[in-house]
A protein has these predicted regions:
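Residue-level recognition of well-ordered beta-strand positions that form the cores
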Residues: 22-24, 45, 145-147, 226, ...
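Solvent-exposed serine/threonine-rich low-complexity stretches and specific carbohydrate-binding patches
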Residues: 57-65
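Extended, low-complexity, turn-rich repeat/linker tracts enriched in Gly/Pro/Ser/Thr and Asp/Glu
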Residues: 25-38
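Extracellular beta-strand ligand-recognition surfaces/modules
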Residues: 17-20, 35-50, 81-155
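Extracellular/lumenal carbohydrate-interaction signature centered on repeated Trp-anchored short motifs
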Residues: 8-19
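Exposed, low-structure sequence patches enriched in small/polar residues
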Residues: 152-336
Length: 338
């Protein structure tokens, strides 16, 4: 038997560490089905849908005996809301289970696949069970389900209350940022300027919420130079050739694997078999953009004949420019389960 309630809401849970919820269960007043502790359980599902891609955590319910209880008494509160019924878990139990499932899936004799429910008991709370099916992600939780499951072989009737489902314990691993600039004037030959900017994962402004902090490392630097090529020729040539060149590079290295967004990229790299596979994932994960610009503006030779003519070199100018942009990174993902 199964009873449940649903909520649709897109949420990124990666910036939190724990998931909590109170649960209360009691037999109905007439108690005709005679339920006992552990015969029913409460569970919560988090995923992109309710059936094919979700994490699940299940807790066997301890029943509160019939009676009158004092809401101001801590001992009575623990009877009504038993610790055994409380959901208080690290969100990492889900991603740890995903790692184990994915490792088991690599063994063709295991029978494990994305399409089959994979379950283990919680090592810290051995009565509770953790499950996964498909490829859910805590980065994109679109559906939440809270349900009650009858684990006995007969009909059972109970009253269940759940309260204060919440995320807690922000990930307080902060980041840092820095930037620098340098300009050099080379007399009348030209100038050189350089700039750099770094922001690491976890960095955010004072006005930003936890969910708005960076989830990647960002590196950017730029080199720019302008100089007058004519200064390197004899004055008699009267050459004017202003040259401009710039080079910039931006690199974004995500904290999480872009192919599996609630798994740390470093863990995904460690799980790969060889350097070739690791380099391939890095090339996909890291987004790198480079710009190269070169221009020669209004180059002219200021030489004219004694009797000015239309075809004098000083009457002509030439300009040339070229811009090159190169992008590297993830552009398309398609994952299929055979």
């Amino acid at each position: 038997g199964l009873g449940d309630v649903y909520k649709r809401q897109t949420m990124d849970m990666r910036q939190y560490r724990r998931l909590k919820m109170f649960a209360h269960a009691a037999a109905l007043t007439d108690n005709v089905t005679d339920p006992e502790d552990g015969q029913l359980s409460v569970f919560i599902r988090l995923g992109s849908d309710y059936r094919s891609n979700f994490y699940e955590y299940e807790i066997p319910l301890k029943l509160t005996p019939a009676g009158h209880y004092n809401g101001d008494s801590e001992s009575d509160q623990l009877i009504v809301w038993p610790k055994d019924n409380m959901l208080d878990i690290a969100l990492s139990v889900f991603t740890d289970l995903k790692k184990k499932r994915n490792q088991a899936k690599n063994n063709p004799l295991s029978g494990v696949s994305y399409g089959k429910l994979y379950s283990e008991y919680d090592s810290e709370q051995p009565a509770n069970k953790i499950s996964i099916i498909g490829n859910p992600s805590l980065a994109e939780v679109k559906t939440m389900m809270i349900g009650v499951r009858n684990n006995s072989r007969s009909k059972k009737s109970i009253e269940v209350w759940v309260n204060e489902l919440r995320l807690s314990d922000f990930d307080e691993d902060g980041g840092w940022a820095a930037q620098g600039n340098m300009n050099v004037q080379l007399s009348d030959l030209g100038s050189v300027s350089m700039a750099g900017h770094v922001e690491t994962a976890g960095f955010g402004g004072l006005e930003q919420s936890v969910s708005e902090r960076r989830l990647d490392d960002y590196y950017q630097y730029q080199f720019t130079t302008t100089f007058e090529l004519g200064r390197f020729f004899p004055k008699a040539v009267k050459l004017s050739a202003p040259i401009y060149y710039s080079y910039s590079r931006e690199k974004t290295s995500p904290k999480y694997n872009p192919l599996d967004k609630d798994m740390l990229l470093k863990d995904a790299l460690d799980a790969l078999a060889n350097d070739r596979e690791r380099d391939s994932l890095r090339n996909i994960a890291n987004e790198i953009t480079t710009y190269k610009n070169f221009s020669l503006s209004n180059m002219r030779v200021g030489v004219t004949s004694k009797n000015p003519m239309p075809y004098d070199p000083g009457n002509f100018t030439m300009s040339y420019s070229r811009t090159k942009r190169h992008n590297q990174g993830l552009s398309l993902i398609h994952i299929s389960e055979p």
